[in-house]
């Protein structure tokens, strides 16, 4: 592996850390209904943990309601239990044909908790980015040790890796700030 491919690999892996952060953020509840809120919830469907979207259709008729229409009558109670077990603080209402989830406005306390969760997810993404930096630097040092890279090139490559890291850490902070602002907006 040469210096350029190590840098490209590091950038790709850092992009994946940001993408994972965005997925986590999409599951964090804000004041609005969103189908992605229930994406992470798994239903114990015939003994197999299955995403809700694979056993029912999920719709968002308005900004305060999510509707879930199971394709199998046996799935109603399973979906209801899975939603109640999730730590989203949602209360499903089952009328026999459809499961409705009304999204209540967030309390100040719940907003603060969600803000903390957003910061935690952002910190995990930063740790992932820094781990990628460490791996890239180790690979670069191996190249230098094997005389495939000069000391000057090593230093320059490590500076490039650090610039990449700084850019992705800043991106993480930016996304975390935007998500916290979205959570705190009433």
Swiss-Prot record:
An MF annotation (GO) of this entry: ribosomal large subunit binding
Keywords, alphabetical: Cytoplasm, Protein biosynthesis
Annotated coiled-coil segments of the chain: none
One Gene Ontology term, aspect cellular component: cytosol
Keyword Protein biosynthesis: yes
Superkingdom of this protein's organism: Bacteria
Principal subcellular localization: cytoplasm
GO biological process, alphabetically ordered: cytoplasmic translational termination
Function per UniProt: Responsible for the release of ribosomes from messenger RNA at the termination of protein biosynthesis. May increase the efficiency of translation by recycling ribosomes from one round of translation to another.
Family: Belongs to the RRF family.
Full protein name: Ribosome-recycling factor
Organism: Nitratidesulfovibrio vulgaris (strain ATCC 29579 / DSM 644 / CCUG 34227 / NCIMB 8303 / VKM B-1760 / Hildenborough)
